[in-house]
Each structure stands twice: as structure tokens, then as C-alpha cells.
Amino acid sequence: MTIIRDNDAPRFGDDGVSVTGLASPSRGCASISAWRVVLEPGAASPEHTLTSDEAFVALRGTAHVELDGEAHDLGAGDCLVVAPERPFRIRNDGAEPFEAVCCMAAGGQAVVAGQGAFVPPWAA
């Protein structure tokens, strides 16, 4: 059993997006990667795709999701599931931070325009 304490979890981020690495292969979990993401008001992810399914469980705040060119709103308690190779981005248009826990298969990669596929550091 592995417990990743909040104080010991690695942190990443810039431009109003902060990510805390939770479960991952480098932190004792061979098959699942999980992380917590916080988008400050006005912050957004770049449009990207993934090589595996990703699930976002919204904990607080609201977010606007663009998935395959369609707009969706996400609020606390909602779960967004994104299938592989579907372009999406998420942004916080609200006045409060948006927070979610995200999961995908270990080894899943992100693909951002102009970059090759990569395993995000919080999921490695």
C-alpha cells in the first residue's frame, strides 16, 4: 500500500493552472495515474487529445469544456469522460477556482498541437 500525502505530492503548473500528482507508476501505482487540477478564474488548458480515456471528477467550481467543437458546462459532482483522440480543452470562466481529480491509464499520453505525444509529468 502506498499513501501519497498532500505535503509530499509533486506540484506542477503555470498560467493559473496547478496540478498535484497523486497516483502514478513513479508513485507506486502501476496501472492508473491520478492527479488533482485547479484552474483559477480565467485559466484554461490548451486544446489537446489523449491516447487513453481520461475522467475528470469535478470537486468545486465550474468549468467550460469544448469537446469536438461542442460546448459543455461542468460543475461540482459532475464527471467528464473524454475518449482517446478527441480534441478538447477546459477553461474556468467563473469567479471561483475550479478543482477536479483526473484519472487515466498509466502511460497515457497527451498530444498538443506543435508537440509530439508525451506522458504528462504528473502522470509519470
Language-model-detected regions and their locations in the chain:
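Short acidic-glycine-tyrosine-enriched beta hairpin
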Residues: 69-85
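Glycine- and acidic-residue-biased ligand/ion/polar-headgroup-sensing regions
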Residues: 53-63, 68
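Short beta-strand His + acidic residue motifs that chelate non-heme Fe in jelly-roll/DSBH
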Residues: 46-47, 65-66, 82, 88-94, ...
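A short, N-terminal "cap"/entry segment at the start of jelly-roll beta-barrel domains
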Residues: 1-31, 111-124
